[in-house]
Swiss-Prot record:
Induction per the UniProt record: Expression is positively regulated by the secondary metabolism regulator LAE1.
Transmembrane segments: none
Protein name: Dehydrogenase FUB6
Summary of the function given for this chain in its UniProt record: Dehydrogenase; part of the gene cluster that mediates the biosynthesis of fusaric acid, a mycotoxin with low to moderate toxicity to animals and humans, but with high phytotoxic properties. L-aspartate is suggested as fusaric acid amino acid precursor that is activated and further processed to O-acetyl-L-homoserine by cluster enzymes aspartate kinase FUB3 and homoserine O-acetyltransferase FUB5, as well as enzymes of the primary metabolism.
């Protein structure tokens, strides 16, 4: 059964030097698609796409490989999404089943066998979703998807929680931060959370259970940390970079550990305008361990992913793990949704609902 459908697609057009401009750096194009599955592959209908700050880093262009490849010019922008299989030539994925993975943000897509078989280090790039608790599908691009796996694998694989230790989580209301806050409380840590608004502060303290927190727009980061952790920090879960990273180093205990998840404050700045950290000597003086990661790294993925799959859906269904979503409707809202992450317009995980199952 074949046929062809119109297929509105979000396309990468040009590398930006600051915030991407819709119509210049990205565009929507109708790229008609044949509804015939390639050998061993799939045709999918995209349901919900997740959007993440790290996508801005991928807009540097395909010639820059680093930790994940940059986006190809004139190709669909991809990210962690959930889709329905509408045509299949692969016995592992029957028609009507749900899949998640790194998918093109378009109304429809072709998933070749090569992508199904590919892996990013320890993790497959596409896998089947079993929604055993009948949860809203947006969870599978958030708490049960990239954000949740990032939080879980790094928390148990790198933070290695110790009851009673003090952890500072910045960008604590973000899709990753909110999960780390709750895992840290489950494991008996003292949690300091920082956010960019009073509304978000109320959320992380009164709903997620952080012990204390502060709004860095109202109180300098270093001053707040000295007030809330006068004896220093055991762990920092670092999402922001810039002055937050400097403050982390400045307030660490001896042999403290900084887990670097991202540098969201720096992604939209040219290199010459990025924050220059001036206290790097404190790393050796205080014997600080700094560890960057990607959720699929062998050293944290393999030992933790099965516990994540067995535990997190149950905790979400029970309300033990809470999350917030900022949802935009329709693929035409992709630019607005993406920019909202950098302009204060989103809270928690930013998702783009494209169609119903």
């Amino acid at each position: 059964m074949g046929g062809e459908v119109s297929n509105k697609t979000w396309v990468f057009k040009k590398s930006p030097s600051s915030l991407p401009e819709p119509g210049v750096h990205t565009a929507f194009e109708d790229r008609p698609l044949s509804l015939v599955a390639p050998p061993g592959g799939l045709v999918i209908k995209l349901l919900t796409a997740g959007l993440d700050p790290h996508q801005r880093d991928r807009m540097r262009g395909a010639g820059n490989v680093d930790y994940v490849p940059g986006y190809e010019l004139d190709e669909p922008i991809t990210n962690f999404s959930i889709a329905k299989v509408i045509r299949s030539d692969n016995d592992a994925f029957e028609e009507g089943s749900l899949i998640a993975g790194s998918l093109p943000i378009a109304e429809y897509g072709i998933i070749p066998k090569e992508l199904i078989d590919a892996r990013a280090m320890a993790s497959p790039l596409v896998w089947k979703v079993s929604n055993n608790y009948n949860l809203d599908l947006k969870h599978y691009v958030g708490t049960l998807g990239l954000a949740g796996m990032t939080a879980w694998n790094s928390f148990y694989g790198l933070v290695k929680p110790v009851k009673g230790e003090t952890i500072w989580i910045n960008a604590a209301s973000s899709s990753v931060g909110e999960v780390v806050v709750q895992l840290a409380k489950i494991e008996g840590m003292k949690v300091i959370a920082s956010v960019s608004s009073d509304e978000k502060l109320d959320y992380v303290v009164n709903e997620l259970g952080a012990d204390v927190g502060f709004n860095y727009q109202k109180e300098p980061v270093g001053k707040a940390l000295k007030r809330l952790a006068p004896d220093g920090l055991d762990v920092v879960f670092e999402n922001v970079g810039g002055d937050h990273f400097q403050a982390a180093i400045e307030n660490m205990k001896w042999f403290g550990r900084i887990i670097s998840c991202g540098t969201a404050s720096q992604y939209n700045k040219p290199v010459e305008e990025q924050y220059g950290v001036t206290n790097l000597s404190e790393i050796f003086r205080r014997r600080i361990k700094i560890q960057g990661f990607i959720f699929w790294d062998d050293n944290i993925y393999t030992d933790n992913i099965e516990n994540f799959k067995a535990t997190m859906p149950k905790w979400v269904s029970e309300g033990k793990i809470k999350s917030r979503y900022t949802q935009f409707e329709g693929i035409e809202q992709a630019d607005k949704a993406f920019l909202s992450m950098f302009t204060g317009g989103s809270h928690g995980k930013t998702v783009l609902k494209i169609s119903d199952p």
